[in-house]
């Protein structure tokens, strides 16, 4: 369903660049967002983030710096986590499912710790950017893979390993985009979207930046070899 009416964003971040770019992405597709709630780590980075929002998105009417995760998450239509975490799930920032409103999108290019009941709830939809990416991670980092990889889609794979969910409960976003599978099915459904990152996106952006540099006549050409080692 169309969620362009989303108005509130709760941003829990420690990686500030990712927090900023995530916010820009959300606003590009949800232009009615007028409230941003922030939970950061240090005052300097929080101040920098607030200034960024004021400068880049003057349409944002309310910017709230939150003292707790709960304050940032409650009543938010979109929840974004860009956190740095420890090497065990028990050390990941905890998010109580009771804080997450019905119909919210939880967008995660990082890790957090949820109660298992949240993942298994019939009103929670598990979505990944590319299922085969997580399949490869699960092979490279054997169960439990969420600890070392620290992307929430790996938690989905751990639940699949434990037979607590089935393969068809992990939705590939490409299938939603192409209409093969449904996205949001009702206004109460909460979606947790795992963003692992895909090399094809890096290649596409790399080409865009390269062509732009050629147009502007900037950059430095590097001499990598006289002839390739393998030919």
Q: Where are these predicted regions, by residue range?
A:
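Hydrophobic/small residue at the entry helix of a nucleotide-binding pocket
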Residues: 18
């Amino acid at each position: 369903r169309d969620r362009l009416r989303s108005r509130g964003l709760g941003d829990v971040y420690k990686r500030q660049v990712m927090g900023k770019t995530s916010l820009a992405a959300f606003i590009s597709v949800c232009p009615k967002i007028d409230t941003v709630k922030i939970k950061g780590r240090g005052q300097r980075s929080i101040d920098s983030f607030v200034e960024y929002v004021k400068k880049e998105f003057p349409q944002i009417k309310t910017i709230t710096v939150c003292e707790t995760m709960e304050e940032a998450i409650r009543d938010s239509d979109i929840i974004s986590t860009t956190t740095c975490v420890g090497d065990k799930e028990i050390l990941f920032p905890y998010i109580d499912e009771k804080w997450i409103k019905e119909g919210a999108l939880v967008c995660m290019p990082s890790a957090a710790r949820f109660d298992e009941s949240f993942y298994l709830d019939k009103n929670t939809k598990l979505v990944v950017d590319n299922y085969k990416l997580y399949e490869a991670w699960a092979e490279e980092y054997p169960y439990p893979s969420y600890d070392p990889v620290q992307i929430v889609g790996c938690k989905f794979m751990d639940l699949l390993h434990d037979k607590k969910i089935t393969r068809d409960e992990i939705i590939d976003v490409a299938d939603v985009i192409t209409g093969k599978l449904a996205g949001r099915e009702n206004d109460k459904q909460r979606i947790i979207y795992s963003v692992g990152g895909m090399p094809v996106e890096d290649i596409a952006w790399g080409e865009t930046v390269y062509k732009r540099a050629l147009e502007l006549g900037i950059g430095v050409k590097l001499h990598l070899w006289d002839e390739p080692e393998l030919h």
